């Protein structure tokens, strides 16, 4: 009898403690789903929408009738915000400028130290970001720079030659079929974007013959992007899972990608370290190395330079090509939009030269179409996660220090209170009554905002415009034998949204 009573009491205590653990949350924390040991609320999100966690979070927000929800991803408390005011508050308030120390970020470094810019915070982040941006600007980063525009034009001419005449070198067969006009997206765009970006950093570009290295870099970069998710995947919750299920957990592909990308940039750094001459400034690399050699200054060392280069270059060899490919999907699904873009380019630019940045002001519908593509298919739906640097409040709720804070850019870009018809691909929303581009109408945030604003926004917008205008000027996007129109529901969710690799048939317009 006593034994049965004790067992009953123990079971009751266990159930009570389990219930309190599951529903318990810090005082004043936003409403949200219960948590279970080890996984927190992560499994609930997977059940709601296994493929798109940003959509699962928005579903929870609607269930709880709150623009902010609180949950746990493993041991980490997380606040996800879905309102315009809340998203802007996170992006512009420096108290949310921290970065959580997730395993996916730490694994990029051999010693699992978080270096670089993306996943760094505190004095090191501020110092490195300020220094790199200051001196990269001298070489054309973040501003109009005539020489860089000429380099981009050379890259576009090389891309057009590859498309029309087919591969010349072995690595080009991975991007274009023999005979030309059938191209693999998103891979085609990224090496040329990366090569233009390399001119900023190294003051040189690779020749087409040498670009096999860039093709592999782009493939590995996209592989890394596709094998994580908004919240660091299961690897950031239980890192030891990589020892049991290295393939299923995504660790093998993440690690393969990371090792290749890091070694690629390490080789460049060592090349310039070995050839450095004091007082000779060939490019940004020499500027940074000179700072390293002034003494053991805070953060200026070989490993930090490697990861800084990875972070500043990563969007150029992954995100730009992916965003262009997402836009191609929409142009194929909305042929009337494509025709209007092409007609505008024909009228303003003609076919005797490539479009340039001076044409942008005279191509408002083309620019509006690119901006609508950035809005409707948010590349980074949950932004890069932020972290509260101190106890604070957000939308009336208490946010403890070290809470992961997620501004849902996807929710912002699909909010009917802002866009009225967010599900519609409608570039006209950014034009005024006279058909001119009206920047006041574009409140989208595809590159974030505040101190964490994507440093490559200017370069990315310029590349998106020049590549889009060039492709639409020269080609129609048609369906080849056995091709189907893009199915947007098949797009992949990782650190970014990306289309699965697909072959696109092109047809000359002139």
UniProtKB/Swiss-Prot annotation:
One of its GO terms (cellular component) is endoplasmic reticulum membrane. This is Probable cytochrome P450 304a1. The keyword Protein transport does not apply. It is a peripheral membrane protein. Its cofactor is heme. The lineage of its organism: Eukaryota, Metazoa, Ecdysozoa, Arthropoda, Hexapoda. PANTHER family: CYTOCHROME P450 15A1 (PTHR24300:SF376), CYTOCHROME P450 508A4-RELATED (PTHR24300). Keywords: Endoplasmic reticulum, Heme, Iron, Membrane, Metal-binding, Microsome, Monooxygenase, Oxidoreductase.
């Amino acid at each position: 009898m006593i034994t049965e009573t004790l067992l009953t009491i123990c079971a009751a205590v266990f159930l009570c403690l389990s219930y309190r653990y599951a529903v318990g949350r810090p005082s004043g924390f936003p409403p949200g789903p219960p948590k279970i040991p080890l996984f927190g609320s992560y499994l609930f999100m997977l059940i709601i929408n296994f493929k798109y966690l940003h959509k699962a979070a928005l579903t929870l927000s609607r269930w709880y009738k709150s623009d902010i929800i609180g949950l746990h991803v493993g041991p980490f408390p997380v606040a996800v915000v879905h309102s315009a005011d809340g998203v802007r508050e996170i992006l512009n308030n420096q108290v949310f400028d921290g970065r959580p120390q997730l395993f996916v970020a730490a694994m990029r470094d051999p010693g699992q130290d978080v270096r670089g810019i993306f996943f760094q915070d505190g004095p090191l982040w501020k110092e490195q970001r300020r220094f790199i941006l200051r001196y990269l600007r001298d070489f054309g980063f973040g501003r109009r720079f005539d020489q860089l525009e000429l380099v981009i034009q050379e890259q576009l001419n090389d891309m057009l030659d590859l498309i029309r005449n087919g591969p010349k070198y072995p690595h080009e067969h991975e991007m274009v079929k023999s005979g030309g006009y059938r191209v693999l997206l998103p891979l085609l765009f990224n090496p040329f974007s990366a090569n233009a970006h390399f001119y900023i950093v190294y003051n040189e570009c690779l020749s087409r013959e040498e670009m096999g290295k860039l093709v592999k870099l782009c493939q590995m970069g996209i592989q890394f992007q596709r094998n994580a998710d908004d919240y660091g995947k299961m690897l950031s919750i239980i890192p030891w899972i990589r020892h049991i299920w290295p393939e299923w957990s995504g660790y093998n592909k993440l690690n393969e990608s990371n090792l290749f990308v890091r070694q690629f940039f390490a080789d460049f750094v060592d090349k310039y370290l070995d050839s450095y001459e004091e007082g000779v400034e060939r490019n940004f690399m020499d500027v940074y190395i000179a700072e390293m050699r002034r003494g053991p200054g805070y953060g200026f060392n070989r490993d930090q330079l490697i990861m800084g280069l990875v972070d500043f270059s990563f969007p150029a060899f992954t995100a730009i090509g992916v965003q262009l490919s997402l836009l191609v999907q929409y142009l194929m699904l909305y042929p009337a939009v494509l025709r209007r873009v092409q007609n505008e380019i024909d009228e303003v630019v003609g076919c005797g030269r490539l479009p340039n940045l001076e044409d942008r002001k005279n191509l408002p519908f083309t620019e509006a179409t690119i901006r609508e593509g950035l809005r409707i298919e948010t590349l980074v739906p949950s932004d890069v996660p932020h972290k509260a640097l101190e106890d604070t409040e957000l939308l009336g709720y208490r946010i403890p220090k070290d809470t992961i804070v997620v501004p849902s850019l996807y929710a912002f870009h699909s909010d009917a209170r802002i866009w009225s018809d967010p599900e519609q691909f409608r570039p006209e929303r950014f034009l005024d009554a006279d058909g001119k581009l009206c920047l006041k109408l574009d409140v989208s945030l595809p590159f974030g905002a505040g101190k964490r604003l994507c440093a490559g926004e200017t370069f990315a917008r310029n590349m998106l415009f020049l590549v889009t205008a060039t492709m639409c000027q020269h080609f129609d996007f048609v369906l080849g034998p056995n091709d189907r129109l893009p199915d947007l529901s098949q797009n992949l969710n990782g650190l970014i949204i990306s289309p699965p690799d697909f072959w696109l048939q092109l047809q000359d317009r002139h």
